[in-house]
């Protein structure tokens, strides 16, 4: 299976790898996993007073497609509102990275992680 240039780029030069302080009330953390393939993804967002995602970090244990999906998701989330971030779909990630059908689940994980991080943030703020 050949990976697209974008997958290779995000895999070899992942953006926003790291960790934010999960105890910070302005940070939401999403942790998701796919037991079928062993991929585990932690995605975190830091939201400013205006409700804009000012930072996003990830740590992914998994294949190149999972790492690339996480990296791209964090890039796309920065500068967006929570509502805008929640509109990011796995199909958009898969299309942007030209993921083969057998790797689509990696983009699903990224979408799930985005939603989980937003949900965690809203829960911390009493918005849910």
Swiss-Prot record:
A GO CC term assigned to this protein in UniProt: cytoplasm
CDD domains, per the entry: IscU_like
One BP term from GO: iron-sulfur cluster assembly
A GO term for molecular function: iron ion binding
InterPro entries: ISCU (IPR011339), NIF_FeS_clus_asmbl_NifU_N (IPR002871)
UniProt family annotation: Belongs to the NifU family.
Assembly and interaction partners: Homodimer. Forms a heterotetramer with IscS; each subunit of the IscS dimer contacts an IscU monomer.
Function, as annotated: A scaffold on which IscS assembles Fe-S clusters. Cluster assembly on IscU homodimers proceeds sequentially from 1 2Fe-2S per dimer, to 2 2Fe-2S per dimer and finally 1 4Fe-4S per dimer. Subsequently IscU transfers the Fe-S cluster to other acceptor proteins. It is likely that Fe-S cluster coordination is flexible as the role of this complex is to build and then hand off Fe-S clusters. The clusters are very sensitive to O(2).
Name of the protein in its database record: Iron-sulfur cluster assembly scaffold protein IscU
Organism whose genome encodes this protein: Azotobacter vinelandii
Gene symbol of the encoding locus: iscU
């Amino acid at each position: 299976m050949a990976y697209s240039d974008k997958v290779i780029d995000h895999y070899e030069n992942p953006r926003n790898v790291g960790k934010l302080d999960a105890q910070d009330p302005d940070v939401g953390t999403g942790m998701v996993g796919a037991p079928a393939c062993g991929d585990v993804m932690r995605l975190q967002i830091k939201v400013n007073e205006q409700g804009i995602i000012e930072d996003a970090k990830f740590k992914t244990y998994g294949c190149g497609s999972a790492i690339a999906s996480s990296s791209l998701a964090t890039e796309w989330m920065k500068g967006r509102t929570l509502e805008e971030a929640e509109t990011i779909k796995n199909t958009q990630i898969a299309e942007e990275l030209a993921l083969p059908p057998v790797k689509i689940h990696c983009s699903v994980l990224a979408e799930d992680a985005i939603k989980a991080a937003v949900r965690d943030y809203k829960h911390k703020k009493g918005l849910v």
